[in-house]
Design a protein with these regions (language model features):
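Metal-ion/cofactor- or nucleotide/acyl-coenzyme-handling active-site neighborhoods
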Residues: 1-34, 41-231
Length: 231
């Protein structure tokens, strides 16, 4: 699968995703689509088929993004899972015969198991970081980010309105307000972020710089909202 297209589009679940979906649907056939586990049911709802769906969380709540049956929509999608995702994730994928693979990151215990033949790759802190690094490994020349807000919307929403766990983030905007303020996308003022999103953003900035310097990959943040990602 290396080099099958020049451009990778990474779909995350920030508040700005909703407005990007019509354009993504229009150009889906012209790029390779990588999506986060939380974006997968949203893309299915809008009949936008990803090439890869990635997941790395160990909690059962994340597994529920796969507790569904989209029938023919899932054909030819590759689900890439970090090797210690919650067991419910693989159970749900196996139930509907979806194609998945387990991958490991570099860690002392993993190395001790001597699973070298299966390979390793660094995955970062979030599933979006994991998507970005896989896109590098698959030798895409351009990486496009959408839905990668890493900040609250002006109305306080943490994720796009189609996100199934919005209720789990109620009160977070009030909790974080004025604590993690950062530069907005396009230098359009300031936005409110969170401690975790700030970590993810810094991780992204390192990855973007590394991709540009060492692999000559150009990254385009097309989120049109959220926090500015330097690089």
């Amino acid at each position: 699968r290396k080099g099958i297209s020049d451009t990778a589009i990474i779909v995350s679940t920030g508040p700005s995703l909703t407005k990007q979906l019509p354009l993504l649907k229009k150009y889906a056939s012209k790029a390779t689509i990588f999506c986060a586990d939380s974006s997968y049911p949203i893309l299915a709802k809008h009949n936008i088929k990803p090439d890869y769906v990635l997941s790395l969380e160990r909690i059962p709540l994340t597994s529920e993004f796969f507790n569904n049956d989209f029938g023919e929509f899932d054909k030819d999608i590759v689900f890439v899972l970090k090797s210690y995702v919650h067991p419910h994730t693989t159970k749900y994928l196996q139930k509907n015969n979806r194609n998945f693979m387990l991958v490991s990151t570099y860690a002392s215990f993993i190395n001790y198991l001597k699973l070298d033949d299966f390979g390793y790759f660094n995955m970062g802190f979030s599933v979006a970081n994991m998507n970005f690094l896989l896109a590098i490994h698959l030798k895409h020349k351009n990486i496009v980010l959408i839905g990668q807000d890493l900040a609250y919307a002006k109305d306080g929403l943490s994720h796009t309105k189609d996100y199934s766990n919005l209720d789990k983030h109620e009160g977070h905007f009030q909790r974080d307000k004025n604590k993690y303020t950062t530069q907005a996308y396009g230098d359009n003022g300031k936005v409110e972020s969170s401690f975790v999103w700030t970590l993810f953003r810094h991780n992204f900035e390192q990855d973007v710089a590394n991709a540009k310097k060492n692999y000559y990959i150009t990254t385009y943040n097309c989120t049109e909202g959220g926090a500015r990602i330097e690089g």
